[in-house]
Amino acid sequence: MLYVKKYLFFVTYLCTLIVYAQDIDVFKQYYGRYSYTAIGNTLNPAENNIYGGFCEILPESSANFNLTPNQNIIAAYLYWAGSGYGDTEVTLNGININADDTLNVEFDDSNWGVLTYFSCYKDITTFIQTNGSINYTLSNLDISSVL
């Protein structure tokens, strides 16, 4: 029994040493009864695979956005991500979109070295409120320098 207690103490102690995290802040908060709708797509013609031929992406990708007449748009954001430090300017339905913010993360892979990834977002609430239920096409995401 003494060994079990020592073992549990040791494991608990180790768990406190190997936990890494960052602070999380609320981005936006809405009060009331809201539902959530998301649409999305990919520019990847195949599954991501570091060992395979993944070095080409599609030039554009589309998704249909449909709202019923009784639904209102409170907020809308465009998110995009990929490999590298980031392409902060993309095109949505022919309109240039510049990121409000870009976030980067680096993953140190024992076989491939440091792999860098990015994610960007843009508040497009007015754009979506104006255009409503249509087909949205994202294009001009350029990550060719890292493929």
Which residues fall in each region the model found?
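Bacterial Sec-dependent N-terminal signal peptides
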Residues: 1-23
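Disulfide-rich extracellular domains of secreted proteins
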Residues: 21-147
